[in-house]
A protein has these predicted regions:
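Aromatic-lined, polymer-binding surfaces characteristic
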Residues: 71, 87, 91, 131-139
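Structural recognition of the beta-strand scaffold that forms the well-ordered cores
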Residues: 46, 89-91, 122, 201-204
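Glycine-rich, histidine-containing beta strand-loop boundary motifs that form or position
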Residues: 74, 79-81, 86, 92-94, ...
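An aromatic- and glycine-enriched ligand-binding surface/loop that stacks and positions planar moieties
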Residues: 1-11, 111, 119-120, 133-229
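Short coil/turn linking the two alpha-helices of tandem helical-hairpin repeats
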Residues: 82-84, 89, 129, 149-158
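Short coil/turn and helix-start
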Residues: 54-58, 90, 130, 156, ...
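Short edge-strand/loop segments of extracellular domains
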Residues: 94-98, 175-176
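Conserved, well-structured interaction surfaces
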Residues: 5-85, 99-101, 105-112, 118-131
C-alpha cells in the first residue's frame, strides 16, 4: 500500500470515490471524527443563533445567513457520511449528560434530514458574508446531487416517490443554479491556490496552508494530480 506523509493514500482515494471500506485505519477514523466535529459546530451555531434571535432581532438578516450556512454544512456533512458508511448516528443537537451516545439511524432517515436541512438553508441564506461563504445556490446544488442519488437508489426513496419524481426534483434544483456560474478555460487551474473561489466555484472549502495543518484538500483533488497538468 502506498504511503504519503504517514497516511494511507489508497484510503484517501477511496474516500474521494465514496468506496471506503469499513475497516479501521487512521484516515477513516479522522474523516469520521472530522465530519462529526463539523456537525457538532453546526448544531451549536443553529442552537445559539436561535437563542440570540429570541432575545434580539437587531441583525436578523446576518444571523439568518449564519444559521443557513450551518444547516447547509450539516447537510453536506451527513451526505458525505452516509455515502461512505450508510447508516450513521444522526446528531441534531449538542450532547448532554443524558444524551452522550446515539445508535445509528437508517440511511433513508439520514437522506430525509439532509433534504430538510438543505431546504432550510435555501430559505435562510442571503449571501451577506460574501466570497468564501456558501450561498443558497450551494444548497440547490447539494439538493440536486441528493435527488440524483435517490433517483438511482430505490431503497433510500421517500414513500410514494419514484425514480422520475426524483429526476424532476433534481432538475428543479439544478436549474436554480444555471447561469449563476461559468466554467473556467483551464480545468487544471481549479486546483491551484491562485484560482480559488473562481467563476466555476459554487462552494469550496477555504483551506490555508498558513492557518491550518490539514490534508482535507487531498480528498477533493484528482487522483495523482500534479500542479500544471
Amino acid at each position: 500500500t502506498g504511503k504519503n506523509g504517514g497516511n494511507n493514500v489508497n484510503n484517501v482515494n477511496n474516500a474521494n470515490l465514496f468506496s471506503l471500506k469499513p475497516t479501521y485505519d487512521i484516515d477513516s477514523e479522522n474523516m469520521w471524527g472530522g465530519l462529526y466535529r463539523v456537525i457538532a459546530r453546526c448544531n451549536g451555531a443553529i442552537e445559539n443563533v436561535s437563542t440570540v434571535l429570541e432575545a434580539s432581532s437587531s441583525d436578523e438578516s446576518g444571523f439568518n445567513d449564519i444559521a443557513g450556512q450551518a444547516y447547509f454544512v450539516r447537510a453536506w456533512s451527513y451526505f458525505s457520511l452516509t455515502r461512505l458508511w450508510g447508516d450513521v448516528p444522526l446528531w441534531l443537537s449538542l450532547p448532554n449528560n443524558e444524551n452522550l451516545h446515539l445508535a445509528t439511524s437508517p440511511s433513508k432517515d439520514i437522506y430525509a434530514q439532509i433534504i430538510s436541512d438543505a431546504e432550510m438553508a435555501i430559505s435562510l441564506m442571503n449571501g451577506n458574508f460574501g466570497t468564501g461563504y456558501p450561498r443558497q445556490y450551494a444548497a440547490n446544488m447539494l439538493l440536486a446531487k441528493v435527488y440524483m442519488t435517490l433517483a438511482t437508489n430505490p431503497d433510500l426513496r421517500a414513500d410514494g416517490l419514484g425514480e422520475m419524481d426524483y429526476w424532476q426534483l433534481a432538475y428543479e434544483q439544478a436549474i436554480q443554479v444555471y447561469g449563476q456560474y461559468s466554467l473556467v478555460a483551464d480545468y487544471s487551474s481549479l486546483f491551484t491556490d491562485t484560482n480559488e473561489n473562481s467563476s466555476e466555484s459554487i462552494w469550496e472549502l477555504q483551506i490555508s496552508q498558513d492557518a491550518a495543518n490539514s490534508q482535507m484538500g487531498r480528498n477533493f483533488t484528482p487522483w495523482k494530480y500534479k500542479l500544471g497538468q
